[in-house]
Design a protein with these regions (language model features):
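N-terminal alpha-helical modules
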Residues: 1-108
Length: 108
């Protein structure tokens, strides 16, 4: 498999994880529809998280900057961090009613 193909495969994996993350984000937003303050905190947290993800992956791939492998390494980094965020969002959506350690109310 050539580098262009590997770059495309890693990008496709990241895009799939990002799509899942966005689906979960919309579900969390829907649960917070009656709580504007917490919804605002979600938006802020996600914006900061995206900046962190991008900066972290730039840092992690700095040794290969400009090389043909860089896109693959960047996509792999972004995919890994996005999958971790997906797990966080999935756990938020499984909170038990009355769990004060969880920012997302249980499904009604």
């Amino acid at each position: 498999m050539d580098q262009v193909t590997m770059n495309a495969c890693s990008d496709a994996a990241f895009k799939q994880s990002d799509k899942k993350l966005n689906e979960l984000y919309r579900q969390i937003e829907a649960r917070l529809k009656d709580d504007a303050d917490t919804k605002k905190l979600l938006v802020q947290a996600q914006q900061v998280w995206v900046k962190f993800r991008d900066a972290e992956c730039s840092f992690q791939t700095s040794a290969s900057a400009g090389g043909t492998v860089t896109p693959m390494l960047a996509s792999m980094c972004m995919d890994g961090l996005t999958q971790s965020r997906v797990k966080d969002f999935e756990s938020y959506l499984k909170c038990k009613e009355g769990d004060l350690s969880c920012p997302v109310p249980s499904a009604k």
